[in-house]
Design a protein with these regions (language model features):
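N-terminal secretory signal peptides and thylakoid transit peptides that target proteins
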Residues: 1-18
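C-terminal segment of N-terminal export signals and the immediately downstream linker at the start
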Residues: 25-58
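All-alpha RGS (Regulator of G-protein Signaling) helical domain and cognate RGS-like helical scaffolds
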Residues: 37-43, 70-73, 80-178
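Acidic/His metal-coordination segments adjacent to aromatic residues that form catalytic metal sites
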Residues: 54-57, 96-101, 182-185
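Second-shell loop/turn segments in exported
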Residues: 60-68, 103-104
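Hydrophobic/aromatic-rich, well-ordered segments within soluble, folded domains that form packed cores
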Residues: 67-68, 73-75, 114-117, 195-205
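An amphipathic alpha-helical core segment
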Residues: 155-211, 215-226
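Low-complexity, Gly/Ser/Thr/Pro-rich intrinsically disordered linker/tail segments
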Residues: 226-227, 231-239
Length: 239
């Protein structure tokens, strides 16, 4: 049975398709790839899940598989399509609205791919953080309990809408911060995310319907702290 695509994916696909049709009808002087230097071919492939989707308490295999196959992998496919269209376009001669539309969708698809990979890497864990990350969370939020409360509350505040909650390292301030993002293009400038919570409806509606808060609670019980710890230590060393 076909799976209904979320509005964000439908809109993105429609935009890419419209740009492709428009690019195909441009005058030859605008559409010729040879009019500008050739672009190296780039092909993105979905990153394999690092866990068994049938073994994540509170999140069903059906939900996680649909999320991975349709939303994450769909973003990868969309990014490949946009990249190919840009490579074939004489960007110096193309109308500005064509370039603007393709570059906007390229950013959305690229960030969707990258943040989804962090989201899946953030799952299938449990327990509590340890070591330098635990110390930093206590230092920057007052306590681990306070961080949990703020992170979960931010996710629940997005329930019924869409977006992301990211725990990010700020190289500027040398501290951890929870950031709110209404779409794939809103992130902390210079921030390095180490943990991602997907609050788009496709991440929970199949299991929880409108009960977004219950999904957030399930996520909080499944955080893979070893992944967050490794990212935190790497980014902290770099700054």
């Amino acid at each position: 049975m076909a799976t209904k695509l979320p509005r964000r994916d439908v809109m993105g696909t429609a935009t890419v398709a419209a740009a492709a049709v428009l690019a195909a009808t441009l005058p030859p002087r605008m559409a010729r790839a040879q009019a500008t230097p050739p672009v190296p071919k780039v092909e993105y492939t979905p990153k394999k899940l690092a866990f068994d989707p049938a073994k994540v308490p509170g999140l069903s295999e059906k939900l996680l598989t649909s999320h991975y196959d349709n939303n994450y992998s769909g973003a990868v496919r969309r990014l490949n399509a946009i990249t190919a269209q840009l490579a074939a376009l004489d960007v110096a001669a193309a109308p500005v609205f064509v370039v603007n539309g393709l570059k906007r969708e390229e950013l959305i698809a690229a960030n969707s791919m990258i943040i989804h990979e962090l989201y899946f890497d953030s799952l299938a864990g449990g327990g509590e953080p340890s070591g330098a990350l635990a110390e930093a969370l206590t230092r920057d939020f007052g306590s681990l309990a306070r961080w949990k409360a703020e992170f979960a509350a931010t996710g629940k505040a997005l329930g019924g809408g869409s977006g992301w909650v990211l725990l990010s390292w700020s190289p500027r301030d040398k501290r951890l911060i929870n950031t709110w993002a209404a779409d794939h293009t809103m992130t902390l400038a210079g921030g390095r995310p180490i943990l991602a919570l997907d609050m788009y409806e496709h991440a929970y509606q199949m299991d929880y319907g409108a009960r977004a808060a219950a999904y957030v609670d399930a996520f909080m019980q499944n955080i893979r702290w070893t992944n967050a710890q490794a990212l935190f230590e790497r980014y902290a060393r770099e700054t």
